[in-house]
């Protein structure tokens, strides 16, 4: 067994100290307790991706980012797998983070469906009606993800089978093309023959803002994962668009009109700002650099001069 050098041990200790100290100093904005219409109001984001596929953060990183962004509830909805969200829920329960609702984005070329409150992955290799049925068989919530015209041929015939639809989404701020328009998402929701829950989601990947679009949940106390899922099933949700218009349960929208509520979407600090935090993070980065350099140096073979050949 190769003996570890003192410089390597020092660099490793700096790295560990930086990680532990950075976590200890992490900003967690206060999430005030708010009531409207006899319910506790929570802010949630139900559409986020991780480095497992095309995101930038780990499931644990999403939980920490949700805490920094003042979210009460978050759901990791990775493409065609529920496993990252289960890891995030474990971490949130361990650290006292936001409530994590397990989820998956069932993703195909024809439709995208957010499945919330499930424990087992729902396969995308089946018709949409079967996808929704499999979600419901797990007592989950089926949400039409960004239902723009691009997906209408598949999702419109089954609109009444969904529990909810995304109404607010980053598409509202940057539309791609004629069949990816935010106005059509609103039409999908408003023209539904049966009421749908109104959802606001950030569809978080990378170089974006978690919690940019939020869902206001009207939850019965005590607050819990089960209470959040109950609010979603009962369609006790509201989302507010970029102009301040509210979509959702009419009685709850009226309650917000009588007593306005402004979602906490302003930017919070993404890291601690104290002197101790800066020192610890600097030590962590220096430690990481030291570990990488020392490992690279250890792998480089040493060149030794060739021994002279003996005289014949």
Can you name each region flagged by the protein language model?
Residues 67-68, 136, 158:
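Non-catalytic positions within long, well-ordered alpha-helices that form the structural scaffold/packing
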Residues 2-44, 109-120, 150-312:
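Charged catalytic cores and adjacent phosphate/nucleic-acid-binding surfaces used
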Residues 49-54, 118-122, 143-144, 173-177:
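Short, flexible loop segments at the rims of nucleotide/cofactor-binding pockets, characterized by
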Residues 75-76, 143-144, 166:
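Conserved beta-strand positions in the central sheet of alpha/beta enzyme cores
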Residues 112-141:
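Binuclear metal-dependent hydrolase catalytic cores centered on His/Asp/Glu-rich metal-binding motifs
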Residues 136-151, 245:
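Aromatic-lined carbohydrate-recognition surfaces of secreted/lumenal glycan-active proteins
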Residues 16-110, 306, 311:
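An N-terminally biased module of ancient metal coordination in phosphate/nucleic-acid-related enzymes
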């Amino acid at each position: 067994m190769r003996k570890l050098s003192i410089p390597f041990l020092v660099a490793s200790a700096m790295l560990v100290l930086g990680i532990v100290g950075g976590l200890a100093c992490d900003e967690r904005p206060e999430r005030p307790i708010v009531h409207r219409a006899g319910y506790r109001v929570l802010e949630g984001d139900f559409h986020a991706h991780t480095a497992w596929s095309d995101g930038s953060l780990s499931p644990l990183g999403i939980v920490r980012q949700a805490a920094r962004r003042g979210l009460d509830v978050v759901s990791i909805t990775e493409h065609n797998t529920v496993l990252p969200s289960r890891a995030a829920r474990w971490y949130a329960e361990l650290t006292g983070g936001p409530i994590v609702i397990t989820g998956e984005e069932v993703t195909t070329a024809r439709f995208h469906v957010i499945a919330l409150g499930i424990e087992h992955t729902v396969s995308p290799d089946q018709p949409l009606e079967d996808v929704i049925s499999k979600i419901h068989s797990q007592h989950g919530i089926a949400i039409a993800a960004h239902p723009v015209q691009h997906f209408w041929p598949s999702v419109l015939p089954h609109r009444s089978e969904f529990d909810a639809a995304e109404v607010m989404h980053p598409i509202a701020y940057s539309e791609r093309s004629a069949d990816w328009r935010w106005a059509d998402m609103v039409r999908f929701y408003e023209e539904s023959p049966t009421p749908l829950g109104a959802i606001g989601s950030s569809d978080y990947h990378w170089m974006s803002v978690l919690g940019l679009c939020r869902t206001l949940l009207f939850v019965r106390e005590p607050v819990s994962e089960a209470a959040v899922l109950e609010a979603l099933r009962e369609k006790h949700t509201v989302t507010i668009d970029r102009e301040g218009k509210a979509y959702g349960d009419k009685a709850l929208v009226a309650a917000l009109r009588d007593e306005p509520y402004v979602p906490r979407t302003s930017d919070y600090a993404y890291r601690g700002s104290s002197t101790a935090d800066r020192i610890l993070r600097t030590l962590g980065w220096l430690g990481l650099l030291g570990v990488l350099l020392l490992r690279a140096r250890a792998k480089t073979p040493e060149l030794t001069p060739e021994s002279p050949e003996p005289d014949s």
